[in-house]
């Protein structure tokens, strides 16, 4: 089955061609801060379409035992903004995906009760791209007047110029093992009730690399931080020059620990009539131990910490199958789920909010053992405020001051083939 998770691409009118300043796209160091209520919506384009494969295989061993294997590659979230959007310092592009391999079994204990379990191997990947604004970082690291002082020293030939913007990229890889267990109760030949539980997934060994695009100006500024006047004046300004220079090294090893939520699910299936099936599902996911924090491997210094105070997600879904003809089945579904981040802590690279799911589809069965399914769905996400989170640390990577509204709506197609 080909399936799609939460996917969105925001206004993406940009070029990926780099320039001599080490930037992916046109220069944006123009002092733009944005205006309160500025709106960022998804824009269709070639890079907002993703192909996400999935595979499921079930093999009956005997009348009571079935073993199965599944694999999926899911984009948990894809966001991309223009280079010049005012919140670019907090992250203008993010790609989070988890590839999961499952091996499991189902066993029928009695005519009305079955149990099942699976083990999973999960591969984690995250990529974040931000625009590093040196002038903004300098103004936040030192007391008021620091940038003016450095500009004066530059005019006197005593310091290099404060560099313009450049791209910084963070790539993280990791893996984890997990398991899931469930049971299925069939009180009648028309009704099935299922429940399952999956514990938290702990990616404790995620590592990767922080890359800062370097040019002549950034190299000269990093050298200035390592010595010269900054060795004398830095302590007076409360700035540790050598430490700041180390934080700006072009290549640094990075690490992250992240916990994905546990999940409890209960579902109901009822064969109402020869033509109509009814379904309902409730899902509970506890995100309260999830956090976004990235550190340097060499010294443990924080690259970025994004406090978001994640909450519990409750999801409700209902659906039906209607069979107008022997070989054709129509599907319809609706779902709703609360967001896990409040307005005051929502960040651009994770603009999560309350959402609703709408889906329509059809299955055609040309032969007894073959079914082809096609579906269309809409994820309708409430527009959410971004840019209010003032708790991002260190302060120099908190991004420019901006207040905006992001809309994560997305559409997707699903194609399935069962043999």
Describe the residue ranges of each PLM region.
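Surface-exposed strand-loop-strand hairpins of Gram-negative outer-membrane beta-barrel proteins
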Residues: 7-48
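Short secondary-structure capping/turn segments at boundaries of alpha-helices and beta-strands
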Residues: 1, 43-44, 53-56
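Outer-membrane beta-barrel porins/channels
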Residues: 18-31, 49-419
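Glycine- and acidic-residue-biased ligand/ion/polar-headgroup-sensing regions
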Residues: 2-6
